[in-house]
């Protein structure tokens, strides 16, 4: 029996949590992917480095007005996602600069999960990840973290 993954986000402000959870849980869950521990770690490491790179060097948001029209073909392209979008009974969804308006995204595994993910599946996975990261750019780092990472001067607040 396939592992059922049902995630509901309302007022999604930081979709990085979803992508981290989904990609990280793929090799560790009961999905019948037949991934070896080596390839599982490589997949997780690639996604982690991509996400860290997006935080360090964020890409500008893409002007996408129809979220459902963009995501559903991607799910069909990947071939193993069953995606339903609910947005206050109104589609298409309006995408603002750094966030989406109120909506719920329900992702569940379907019966068309492939029995195995081979190395040929990595390019579409990575391409989809990049596109989704551009659609939902990560929020900017807090000033103190940015100062620690980039060596800017940190001004301490006095009590």
Swiss-Prot record:
The chain crosses the membrane at residues 17-37, 44-64, 67-87. Keywords: Membrane, Transmembrane, Transmembrane helix. It is found in: Membrane. It is a multi-pass membrane protein. This is Putative uncharacterized protein YDL172C. Partially overlaps YDL173W. GO terms for cellular component: membrane. Its main location: membrane.
